[in-house]
């Protein structure tokens, strides 16, 4: 509930302040969070980045090797394979505004330059989160937000590590607000 309530407030802020830029979700899974973003912004494109087939073995290996995530966790969530892009698109109120970017991120980054007003990152693992921050944060318009899921999830230590490593790369701290949802979502403002 808290995550969706926070999303509602962020959407109000973006609308009230006329923040330009598109929408994106990195780590779409079955599209429930994306669906809400799409419904609230009929005039914006929504970029949907996902393998639509579960975690990539390269990212799993990095998390296990660095003790960010235990192998049993991947078994418990069945690698989030229970999805496909057609299932996601059918949930959308404005499906024509959706741009599916199926495959391994960051290989699926759009060729054209896109700026964003709202991005959800919910891919659980260190490398795609770090790559997501590298791509999205510089392209966020002032007044825009990134919602990063699982920031305080004890089983997913790579999420917080990716944020810290990104801050080291750019040489400064991000404007971050943790929210008290069950997985410890982090809101990053620009």
Report each predicted region and the residues it spans.
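Conserved SAM-binding loop and adjacent beta-strand
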Residues: 1-6
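S-adenosylmethionine/decaboxylated-SAM
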Residues: 8, 17-190
């Amino acid at each position: 509930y808290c995550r969706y309530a926070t999303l509602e407030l962020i959407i109000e802020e973006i609308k009230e302040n006329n923040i330009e830029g598109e929408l994106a979700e990195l780590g779409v899974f079955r599209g429930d969070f994306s669906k809400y973003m799409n419904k609230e912004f009929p005039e914006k494109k929504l970029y949907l980045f996902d393998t639509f087939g579960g975690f990539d073995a390269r990212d799993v290996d990095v998390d296990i090797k660095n003790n960010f995530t235990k192998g049993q966790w991947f078994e418990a969530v069945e690698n989030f394979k229970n999805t496909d892009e057609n299932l996601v698109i059918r949930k959308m109120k404005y499906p024509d505004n959706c741009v599916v970017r199926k495959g391994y991120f960051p290989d699926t980054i759009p060729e054209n330059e896109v700026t964003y007003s709202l991005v959800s990152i919910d891919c659980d693992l260190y490398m795609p989160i770090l790559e997501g921050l590298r791509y999205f944060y510089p392209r966020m318009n002032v007044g825009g937000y990134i919602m990063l899921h699982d920031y305080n999830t004890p089983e997913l230590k790579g999420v917080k590590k990716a944020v810290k490593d990104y801050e080291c790369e750019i040489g400064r701290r991000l404007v971050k607000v943790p929210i008290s949802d069950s997985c410890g979502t982090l809101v990053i403002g620009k």
